[in-house]
Amino acid sequence: MARRPWHCYKKIKRPSYQKKRSRSHRKEYVRGGPDSVLRMFDTGNRKRPLGDWELSLGIKIMHDLQLSHRTLEAIRTSLNRNLQKHLTREAFLIRIRPHPWQMIRENKMMAFAGADRLQSGMRNSFGRVMGRAARVHANQTIVEIFCDFQNKDIVIKSLKTAAYKLGAKNRLAVLRMKKPEEHSTKIGLMIALEK
């Protein structure tokens, strides 16, 4: 059966169903479902300390919405592929910020002749888990890339390509910078420095 289009789940309008592993080992309300497609949240040079990078650029989302785990993985692979074409793996670090904890449910319906005799319609319509999502809020950072000033043009171009995969309004921003008084005029992006 084909996947339901994501605009059915994009808005945050339902209660959150999270799959948790508690210490008391009590049964959770959400069971089963597929694992997240997104396995790696950090890609690139993970050995270099974060304080040593000269610059950090990222994508900030403009609205409250849910992002599927497939979207986050598509952003990560797109960035990784584009950056490795031009830079070595030691020259950048990609970090995906939100984690897909929310379980997305679907009440599967049959759509063919005589289907009304085989299914129960909206009775017991809670549905089964069919995927995962991350709930993000306005002005939240989705992805962050650490790099040096000499590679900033390549990183900005890769971020613009990856931003199309979000399917929502977003903007590129400078998140961290060494010596902002020297370099702030040379970047050409909104500066939203994080502590």
Locate each region found by the language model:
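Ribosome-associated RNA-binding proteins
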Residues: 1-195
